[in-house]
């Protein structure tokens, strides 16, 4: 079979995307802590409502989190949670 007959596959760089999402969540969490907020409550508020006012501008957290779709953030959180549960 020649190279021309083979089906090429394209895979998104999922590891890079996951790492970026994870780094963003950690940065946002730290910014919320530094400002004296309850990070989990604020992130949940943002995820449920889509209102960026739940996230402070401190350390550019608001702009960072808005660059990632909320469904991608939820996907990463669920994957991380389930992976941790499997290891228990």
Swiss-Prot record:
NCBIfam families: PRK05473.1. InterPro entries: IreB. Coiled coil: none annotated. Belongs to the UPF0297 family. Pfam families: IreB (PF06135). This is UPF0297 protein EAT1b_2723.
């Amino acid at each position: 079979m020649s190279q021309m007959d083979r089906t090429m596959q394209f895979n998104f760089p999922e590891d890079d995307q996951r790492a970026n999402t994870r780094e963003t969540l950690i940065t946002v969490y730290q910014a919320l802590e530094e400002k004296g907020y309850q990070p989990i409550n604020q992130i949940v508020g943002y995820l449920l409502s889509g209102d960026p006012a739940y996230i402070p501008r401190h350390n550019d957290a608001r702009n960072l989190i808005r660059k990632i779709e909320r469904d991608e953030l939820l996907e990463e959180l669920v994957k991380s949670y389930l992976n941790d549960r499997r290891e228990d």
